[in-house]
Amino acid sequence: MIHPSALVHPAAQVDPSAEIGPFAIVEAGAIVGAGCRLAAHAILKAGAVLGAGVVVDHFAVVGGDPQDLSFDPSTASRVTVGARTVIREHVTLHRATKPDTATVIGADCLLMAGSHVAHDCVLGDGVILANGCMLGGHVHVGAKAFVSGGVAVHQFCRIGGGSLTSGNAVITEDVPPDGLAHGRNELAGLNLVGLRRRGVPAEAIAELKRAYHAVYRPGQGCAALAQAELAGGAYRTAEGRAFLEFFLGGKRGRFVQPS
């Protein structure tokens, strides 16, 4: 159902089962999947693609131009939002900077009020961004990570899956999977509460603890230590291997450190 006051461009694709609220705007080229709900004053810009069951709340803007001084507004790029993701009030999601590329939001995410996802970010499934969280351009956030309120993440950083970043943290370095980050690039160990809530087996948690202590040794590089641990072939769980492999990737090679 489309409210009479909504502005839906004829070139937009809106599934008949979607609900478009009062004064919402859907621009040409936007795609709204089955069962989506756009609240009053929600805005979908050209290039916004919503999977099934996505909720876009009041005054949220999906698909706005990147805040990049070199960006050409004529660039045909996208924001894709996975099924059942909830986008709350005043959230801003910016489209990618290059032609035929996308800022990607996974399925079953929750983007709380006032959070911002900049151009070219990639969020895995089940990510939660709390109120006022800000992600710079090209940030990657792994599945089921929780980024708390007021957190600022520098461009090109990676936030590992299953990690928890505490409120008002400043992150300019990579946070490992299942890590517990706080303050300014500080690490308080593993997110053990989150691991247990997700039902991660005890064997995997034990391997994560072993990997954590193997990689974080004073005065030694995390990447080299992670490579040595993997070469030993002693890690049998996906969680343990993923933790170590994280240190071999990324663009910046800098990681949050234990406080």
Each language-model region and where it sits:
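Terminal amphipathic alpha-helical/low-complexity segments used for targeting or macromolecular assembly
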Residues: M1-S5, P10-A11, P16-S17, G53, ...
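Structural signal for interior beta-strand "rungs" in well-ordered beta-sheet cores
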Residues: M1-E186
